[in-house]
């Protein structure tokens, strides 16, 4: 008995000591900016390690399942036995379908990605769900589906960062920054491009550049890139050889033209993905079998693609002979079409992954094809297919993924040629403007739109959703029966005793607001004993719902031209649950906006 008591006391002491150390760490990371920067670096190391491990696992799967040589990329157009090309995606689809069906039984909520987490939930993500997404991405890509691993990199990195930040109980904005650090580390490790990883976090995951986020995100991206360099012998996933490519001022209009055309291709790819999802959703088969059906289609497309993948990757087609150049251009056009279809089918049937890698590949093909066609029609222009491949690659990724400056830095870091920057910057801007004007969404925000979410970026709109009327309203409001006499009302509610009184009917439902200035008007003194309150009510049809956010409430106040409105539970029962004044709603709204401004400027560390 004494031994058990001693063990119990010891375990309590250990637990108490751990709690004290955790509390101390929480204070340090909340109070010290340098400590938070180091925390971001730790997140970058973890994300870079996860991305490197995932990349190696997928590479091993390619070597084992498709029978390619060690260190050879499956996307390099190497010869693969035809039966492997057909059967591996089908088998992979069956395995993925079984995994998704099994995980769905234990998952009670929808998976939240880093963009949605930062936009709505203040950076909160589930680590188990994120690891599940990473596993599904590896199964999809490893079995030959035309999807990118970047979705898995950012999901796993963001999930680990969110879990760590939640354990340390960091502030809402700091948690959003940590999720951005996880994404930055993963992308930087994948492409060995720390600047691209950092701006991926700024533009796509955090939703904007801020002083407070600069140091932790950049340190995280650098840490992820260093980890990948130490653990991986492979080059970047899409190596494109460029060397000191000159800038041609006389071809500037052609650069803008290829950017606009590439943006149109990117829009078509996104629409094709949506159409594919709808077609697979309409199939009368189990969702677990749809990846296998899509895998069969992808295998057939891959079989045709590999017959002409070598000439497609020959981006110097314009330097070939006339007949050879035509064959190269035809091969590039065929691969462009088949790769687009394969990506649309892969995502539509349920394979897990993104369009980042596909957008880079398709963009490079589009640029090389454009340069080859122009050189064939106008030999005197002598466009460099490699330069136009890089330009179009950046434009396509800016259209599909978003984040124009992410793609500028990615292209520069992948090629090592800063002379391309003056051409890439205007091209990605043209592509982004074209996509915004003609389509209005990136691939991620387009999927949010189809789901009914009003998310256009990772900007934090969750605080608006959390600041609801139910949280702002006052519940101790006075009520009166609508059939009461004015004289009784004046007796029960003397002038100055209340700011407003809500009238309800015999069933307790909202009837209107009694304006006190009207109830105590001098012209009603003689008729007070015979006048009922129903004749004096205002705002009979203007009410607030407890589920409204503060922005919707302010808009309702403006439309009703009211200083205060009653809050009802729903529009059917109309039972009064509280009252809210416009002045208080505006004060809280402005207070939250000021808090967001302070976080953006990094002032929260010193407050």
What positions do the PLM features span?
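Juxtadomain coupling helices with adjacent low-complexity linkers
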Residues: 582-607
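Short hydrophobic beta-strand motif reused across regulatory alpha/beta modules
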Residues: 409, 511-519, 577-585
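Bateman (tandem CBS) regulatory domains
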Residues: 454, 464-477, 484-485, 515-518, ...
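Hydrophobic, well-ordered secondary-structure elements that form the walls
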Residues: 353, 402, 430, 472, ...
């Amino acid at each position: 008995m004494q031994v058990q008591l001693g063990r119990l006391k010891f375990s309590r002491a250990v637990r108490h000591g751990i709690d004290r150390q955790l509390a101390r760490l929480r204070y340090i990371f909340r109070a010290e900016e340098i400590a938070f920067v180091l925390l971001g670096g730790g997140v970058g190391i973890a994300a870079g390690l996860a991305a490197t491990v995932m990349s190696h696992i997928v590479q091993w799967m390619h070597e084992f399942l498709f029978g390619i040589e060690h260190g050879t990329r499956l996307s390099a157009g190497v010869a693969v036995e035809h039966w492997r090309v057909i059967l591996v995606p089908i088998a992979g689809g069956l395995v993925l379908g079984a995994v998704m069906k099994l995980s769905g039984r234990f998952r009670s909520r929808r998976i939240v990605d880093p963009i949605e987490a930062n936009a709505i939930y203040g950076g909160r993500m589930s680590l188990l769900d994120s690891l599940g997404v990473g596993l599904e991405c590896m199964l999809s890509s490893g079995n030959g589906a035309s999807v990118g691993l970047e979705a898995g990199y950012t999901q796993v990195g963001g999930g680990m960062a969110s879990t760590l930040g939640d354990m340390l109980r960091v502030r809402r904005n700091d948690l959003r920054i940590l999720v951005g650090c996880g994404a930055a580390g993963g992308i930087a490790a994948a492409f060995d491009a720390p600047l691209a990883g950092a701006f991926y976090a700024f533009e796509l995951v955090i939703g904007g550049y801020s002083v407070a986020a600069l140091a932790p995100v950049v340190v995280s991206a650098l840490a992820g890139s260093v980890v990948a360099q130490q653990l991986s012998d492979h080059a970047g996933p899409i190596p494109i050889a460029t060397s000191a490519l000159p800038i041609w001022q006389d071809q500037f209009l052609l650069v803008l033209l290829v950017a606009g055309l590439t943006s149109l291709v990117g829009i078509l790819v996104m629409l094709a993905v949506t159409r594919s999802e709808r077609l697979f959703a309409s199939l009368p088969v189990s969702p677990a079998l749809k990846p296998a059906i899509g895998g069969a289609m992808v295998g057939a497309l891959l079989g045709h693609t590999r017959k002409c993948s070598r000439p497609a990757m020959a981006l110097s087609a314009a330097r070939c002979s006339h007949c050879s150049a035509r064959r190269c251009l035809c091969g590039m056009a065929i691969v462009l079409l088949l790769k687009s279809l394969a990506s649309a089918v892969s995502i539509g049937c349920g394979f897990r992954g993104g369009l980042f890698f596909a957008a880079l590949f398709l963009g490079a093909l589009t640029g090389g094809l454009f340069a080859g066609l122009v050189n064939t029609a106008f030999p005197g222009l002598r466009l460099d297919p490699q330069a136009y491949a890089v330009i179009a690659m950046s434009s396509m990724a800016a259209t599909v993924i978003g984040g124009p400056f992410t793609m500028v830095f990615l292209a520069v870091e992948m090629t090592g040629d800063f002379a391309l920057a003056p051409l890439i910057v205007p091209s990605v801007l043209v592509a982004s403007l074209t996509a915004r004007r003609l389509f209005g969404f990136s691939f991620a925000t387009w999927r949010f739109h189809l789901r009914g979410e009003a998310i256009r970026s990772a900007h934090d709109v969750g605080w608006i959703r959390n600041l609801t009327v139910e949280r702002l309203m006052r519940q101790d409001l006075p009520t009166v029966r609508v059939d009461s006499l004015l004289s009784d009302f004046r007796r029960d509610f003397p002038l100055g005793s209340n700011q407003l009184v809500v009238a309800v009917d015999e069933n307790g439902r909202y009837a209107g607001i009694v304006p006190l200035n009207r109830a105590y008007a001098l012209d009603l003194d003689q008729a007070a004993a015979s006048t009922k309150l129903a004749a004096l009510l205002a705002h009979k049809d203007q009410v607030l719902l407890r589920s409204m956010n503060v922005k919707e409430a302010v808009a309702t106040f403006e439309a009703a031209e009211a200083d205060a409105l009653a809050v009802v539970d729903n529009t059917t029962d109309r039972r009064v649950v509280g009252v809210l004044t416009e002045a208080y709603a505006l004060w809280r709204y402005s207070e939250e906006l000021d808090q967001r401004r302070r976080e953006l400027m990094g002032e929260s560390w010193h407050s």
